[in-house]
Swiss-Prot record:
Key words, A-Z: Ribonucleoprotein, Ribosomal protein, RNA-binding, rRNA-binding
Recorded GO CC terms: cytosolic small ribosomal subunit
Family of this protein: Belongs to the bacterial ribosomal protein bS18 family.
Task performed by this protein: Binds as a heterodimer with protein bS6 to the central domain of the 16S rRNA, where it helps stabilize the platform of the 30S subunit.
This protein's name: Small ribosomal subunit protein bS18
Subunit structure: Part of the 30S ribosomal subunit. Forms a tight heterodimer with protein bS6.
Keyword set includes RNA-binding: yes
InterPro entries documented for this protein: Ribosomal_bS18, Ribosomal_bS18_CS, Ribosomal_bS18_sf
Organism per entry: Xylella fastidiosa (strain Temecula1 / ATCC 700964)
NCBIfam families, sorted: S18
Length: 76
C-alpha cells in the first residue's frame, strides 16, 4: 500500500461548467502559471486538452497585451 494518498486530478473548467477561458480573467490565468511565468502542463494540473489549448492561447494573448509579464521580476 502506498505511503501517501495521491489526490485525483480533475479539470476545474469542466467541473465549473466554463465553456471558454477569457484572457481578461487574470486570477484564473495566474493559477496556471509558475512563479517564473511559465504555463503549468496539463499532466500536473489535470486540465483537459481542450481547455489547456484555450488556456495557452489566453495566456499568450494576455502576455502580448501586457496584462501578465512574460517572466518574473528580475532584480538587476
Amino acid at each position: 500500500m502506498s505511503k501517501f494518498f495521491r489526490r485525483r486530478k480533475f479539470c476545474k473548467f469542466t467541473a465549473e461548467g466554463i465553456k471558454e477561458i477569457d484572457y481578461k480573467d487574470l486570477n484564473t490565468l495566474r493559477q496556471y502559471l509558475t512563479e517564473n511565468g511559465r504555463i503549468v502542463p496539463s499532466r500536473v494540473t489535470g486540465t483537459k486538452s481542450k481547455y489547456q489549448r484555450q488556456l495557452t492561447t489566453a495566456v499568450k494573448l494576455a502576455r502580448f497585451l501586457a496584462l501578465i509579464p512574460y517572466t518574473d521580476n528580475h532584480d538587476i
